[in-house]
């Protein structure tokens, strides 16, 4: 198994699966039963990761993360219908698909931002973030030259989800800040850092005019997605919209949204110019601090497998490397 791509938000088109499942709803309901699991052999990568989680965080406090890791190793995909009462499952898109799955987490299309304190702080920084973004992106050629992977498109295997009209400029990836790009957008990076956002990923996302993002799931339920709308064409005219499950909202400049992309979702830009947002992958609010740290440890092991080396000196050096990479750029 390619763990690095599996244990993370991975936008893949699930429309074909959804059509099949609607035709056999009883089969769909039966797949929501979570199978029993057992530890992977200690000599395998999966076994070493689990052993590391137990050693660092304790089996009891990190049990849901351990279960999630074991389920991934069995190639389990959680499927469940979350449509409101009275919703026709044959026409609804409110289905959850997740192969990176922590059992027992709350599922709802959009979260009330009044319940999430950092969203208010972020919204207050909107004008400064927008101004810096527009100033820096005036000269796209210079930005391309100075930055890392500026406006990179989705990977080939992901194109069925995000499509060719979507591209990103990363500030943080799997808990690691991109020093080069953060230094190009220092006010934005500092604002994000000061807000205390529990983000594993932070990036600007662009969407070309007259394009859409097809119906898909990001296949991970232990992170939610958040958007700060930065530059929305025809702002307020419902030209740029996002649908999570069966609920549709439009992006409005300066507003923050938090939603669950393990549910089927799609998006559209019907305007004649680019749409820009600042996007976050954040830990699910139901997770404990220990669970967040245990999940981050898995990310770290995927990025720096030397963390699992049998040699203590190699492990110590890897831990130092991870700590350095996680530091906020000065």
Annotate each PLM feature:
Residues 1-13:
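N-terminal chloroplast transit peptides
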Residues 2, 216, 265-266:
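Histidine-centered active-site/metal-ligand motif
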Residues 6, 21-23:
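Proteolytic processing junctions in secreted/extracellular precursors
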Residues 24-203, 207-217, 289-330:
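Fe(II)/2-oxoglutarate oxygenase catalytic core
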Residues 126, 166, 199-201, 210, ...:
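Extracellular structured ligand-interaction cores
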Residues 171, 206, 230, 244, ...:
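Hydrophobic side chains in beta-strands
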Residues 206-208, 218-235:
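Short, conserved beta-strand element in jelly-roll/cupin
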Residues 222, 234-330:
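Catalytic core of Fe(II)/2-oxoglutarate
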């Amino acid at each position: 198994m390619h763990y690095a791509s599996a244990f993370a938000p991975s936008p893949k088109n699930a429309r074909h699966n959804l059509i099949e499942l609607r035709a056999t709803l009883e089969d769909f309901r039966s797949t929501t039963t979570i199978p029993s699991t057992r530890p992977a052999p200690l000599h395998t990568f999966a076994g070493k990761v689990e052993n590391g989680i137990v050693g660092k965080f304790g089996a009891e406090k990190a049990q849901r993360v351990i279960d999630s890791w074991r389920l991934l190793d069995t190639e389990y995909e959680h499927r469940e219908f979350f449509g409101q009462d009275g919703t026709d499952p044959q026409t609804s898109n409110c289905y959850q698909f997740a192969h990176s799955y922590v059992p027992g987490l709350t599922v709802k299309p959009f979260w009330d931002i009044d319940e999430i304190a950092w969203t208010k702080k972020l919204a207050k920084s909107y004008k400064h973030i927008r101004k810096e973004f527009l100033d820096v992106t005036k000269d796209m050629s210079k930005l391309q030259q100075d930055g890392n992977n500026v406006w990179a498109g989705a990977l080939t295997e992901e194109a069925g989800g995000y499509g060719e009209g979507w591209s990103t400029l990363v500030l943080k990836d799997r808990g690691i800040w991109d020093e080069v790009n953060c230094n190009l957008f220092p006010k934005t990076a500092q604002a994000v850092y000061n807000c205390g956002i529990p983000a594993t990923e932070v990036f600007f996302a662009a969407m070309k005019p007259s394009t859409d993002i097809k119906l898909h799931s990001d296949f991970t339920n232990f992170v939610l997605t958040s958007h700060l709308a930065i530059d929305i064409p025809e702002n307020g005219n419902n030209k740029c919209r996002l649908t999570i499950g069966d609920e549709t909202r439009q992006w409005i400049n300066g507003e923050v949204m938090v939603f669950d992309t393990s549910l089927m979702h799609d998006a559209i830009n019907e305007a004649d110019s680019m749409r820009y947002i600042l996007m976050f992958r954040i830990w699910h609010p139901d997770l404990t601090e220990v669970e967040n740290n245990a999940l981050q440890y898995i990310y770290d092991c995927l990025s720096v497998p030397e963390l699992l080396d049998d040699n203590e000196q190699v492990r110590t050096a890897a831990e130092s490397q991870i700590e350095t990479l996680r530091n906020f750029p000065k």
